[in-house]
Amino acid sequence: MTYFLGLTGGIASGKSTADEFFKKKKIPIIDSDLIAHQIMEIGQNGYKAVVDYFGTDILNDDQTINRRKLGGIVFNDKAKLKKLNELTHPLVHQEIKQQMARYRANQEKLVVIDVPLLFESGFESLCNGVLAISITPELQIERLMKRNAFTKKEAVARISNQMPLSEKEKRATYVVANTGTIGDLEKKLSDLLQEIGR
């Protein structure tokens, strides 16, 4: 039986580092962010829905969606963020479920489902267990500013639009703190794989 491990955490908490670890271990990953990017490419259903609603002002000269511009709109307006999620989440969910079915048919032992908004979008019900990557709020702001070249205000706006990490930690099956080095995180993830017997 395939064990589906939901992977979540806050923005800049270290999910990508965890993903890299699982890839090195040859564990398949269903990446919801990647799927969300793919459905917003020219010609895809998500692209049409988003451009129809938000208008052509969000487009680059080559007609691709300017994600920074779209982010600037939705992360400062909760109603518009809600609308963007309503337009894109069903398409992302559909693709995740299709990928899960393929892995189940191939009898994979363990599959990681990386969904930053796992609890917010009700995806935990599809997982056998949920891993939350935890980080302190100060470190989260610092890493996000560094990673995305955000101002402190932009970083705080992005973080405040997500469920508090403390809430995710309470609801998760497993919690791994990412407050040290990459090596520290990888050691904790190795221990976790042993714990779940994979």
UniProtKB/Swiss-Prot annotation:
GO terms for biological process: coenzyme A biosynthetic process. The keyword Transferase applies. Gene3D superfamilies: P-loop containing nucleotide triphosphate hydrolases. It catalyses: 3'-dephospho-CoA + ATP = ADP + CoA + H(+). GO terms for cellular component: cytoplasm. Pathway: Cofactor biosynthesis; coenzyme A biosynthesis; CoA from (R)-pantothenate: step 5/5. This is Dephospho-CoA kinase.
